[in-house]
Amino acid sequence: MEQKILVVDDARFARKVAIKSLNNGGFDNIVQATTAAEAKEVFLNENPDLVLLDITLPDNSDLTLLEWMISVRPDAKIIMTSAIAQDLIIEDSIKAGAKAFIAKPFMEKAFLEKIFEVLEAEDKQ
């Protein structure tokens, strides 16, 4: 598929799983980042159609990076990911501008359904 997806996660295994799932869903234009600083650079230079953003990074452990991305591109399609799926974290992520939240570990089918849902919902607006 043509859409470019940025996967931001400091855990190598989590990135590999997400990328494999995205490839299985037909996405092959994928860029990666492992820190907030790297994610900012890639976000600005690559202009991704969708961002999968882990909430906890070595240099960012809250919603600061999400808020920065939304301030730079208010129309950004960002899905937060985390192994900590507490209601408050999910609510705060959505309030800050995330389009969805995916708890890790995830099942590939549900993961891809959420990806397509966010991409399609945004395209209809």
Model-predicted segments: where are they?
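C-terminal output helix
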Residues: 88, 106-115
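Acidic, metal-coordinating helix/loop segments flanking the phosphotransfer/catalytic sites
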Residues: 32-50
